[in-house]
Amino acid sequence: AYNQRKDRWSISYLRKAEKERIARGEIEVTGKDENGALILQFSKTVGRMKNPVTVWNQRSHNAGAGGSNVLRALIPGRAFAFPKSVYAVLDTIRFAVANKPHALIIDFFAGSGTTLHAVNLLNAEDGGHRRCIMVTNNEVSAEETKSLSAQGFQPGDDEWEKLGIARYVTWPRTVCAIEGHDVNGHPLKGNYLSGDPEHPRAMAEGFK
């Protein structure tokens, strides 16, 4: 390669990492120069990879704005302590599967279902077909346990199970996010904070 500033030629060899990026389509071979050296450029259709920084300071990553507020819109009146921001999870998984449109993501601690919600958002942004498997039990909160026990209910009773995290939070949140309405059947209001800021995705649009 010729360095015009230093008026110097040098020989550069493709390392294994660069060859792998060419194979993945991240770097394109656009031709050869007069000396037979390959001409490379970063793909315009595949996002350029970069290492994540240690600290993220974005309002959308706040557990209140991107976590509690989103969950409250989907399942109003149903409490869940400290839900993660769907946008923080979205940006986290983007680093791992941005160039894997058919990836399968497994969340062994599904909680309120934020990971699946984030996967749907990423698919909506780039047209991917990623899938997500969520694993959770159906335990009730400590407060609900005391209340239900005092009423004579126990695990396995319908009154107990319907207040468990899977049936009361995770599953309803997932259905509502996909269908674009809250648990009461009302269309969701507002837009998602991710994606194209000029053409934001309406929450009521869901993920069909």
How would you label these PLM feature ranges?
Residues 1-104, 126-129, 139-145:
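Class I S-adenosyl-L-methionine
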Residues 73-74, 148-155, 188, 192:
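Generic alpha-helical propensity signal that fires on short helical segments
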Residues 82, 86-180:
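Conserved S-adenosyl-L-methionine
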Residues 178-205:
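Short mixed-charge
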